[in-house]
Amino acid sequence: MKLNVTIEIPKKSNVKYEYDRKTNQISVDRILFGTEVYPHNYGFIKEALDWDGDELDALVIADQSFLPGIIVPAKIIGAMEMIDDGETDTKLISVIDCDPRYKHINNLSDLGEHTLKEIQNFFETYKLLQNKKVVIKGFKDSAWATKEYNECVELMKKYGKMDKDEFVNKMKKEHPEKYKA
C-alpha cells in the first residue's frame, strides 16, 4: 500500500512536534527528556484517526531527514502495535517510495531484525524519564497494517470532528480490546 505521510519529526531529532487537527499546524510539543533521538522520520496519515484520538502515526525509513510539514510518498510494509500510557498508538512502518534504494523493501523482514529492534527500543525507552509506560505488543505485516489503516480512515470519517478526550473515552467503552496491553 502506498500513502502520503506528513512528516512531524525528522530522523535524528529530539524535538517532539505535534500536529493539531483543529489549527492545521505543527508545533513543538516538548523536547524528549532523555538522550534519545527519533531513529527514522516520523509523521502521520492525515485521513486516518488512530484509537488514541490523533492521526495514525507512520515511520518513514529513508536515508534523508525531512522537515516537519513535508509530505513524503511512502510504501507501507508493516506496523508496530503499541500501548502508550494506556492508549492504543499504532505506528505504521514504511519506506520512502521515490528512492530506488528502497524499491526492494516490501515487508518488515526485508528491513532486517536489527532495524526492528532499534525501532522497538526507541519507543520502549523514549518516555522513561517522563514516568510513562509504553508497551510494544509486537510487529505486524503489511496486510494487518492495511486493515488498520482502513479502519482508521473510517474512524476519521465518523469521529474526526470529535474532541480527542471524548473520542478516547467513547472508544475505550465501545472497544476495550483496543486498549489492552
From Swiss-Prot:
Disulphide bridges: none
Sequence positions that bind Mg(2+) 1: 52, 57, 89
GO MF assignments: inorganic diphosphate phosphatase activity; magnesium ion binding
Cofactor(s) listed in the protein's UniProt record: Mg(2+)
Reaction equations catalysed: diphosphate + H2O = 2 phosphate + H(+)
Principal location: cytoplasm
Enzyme Commission designation: 3.6.1.1
Binding site for Mg(2+) 2: 57
GO cellular component: cytoplasm
Assigned protein family: Belongs to the PPase family.
Protein name: Inorganic pyrophosphatase
Organism: Malacoplasma penetrans (strain HF-2) (Mycoplasma penetrans)
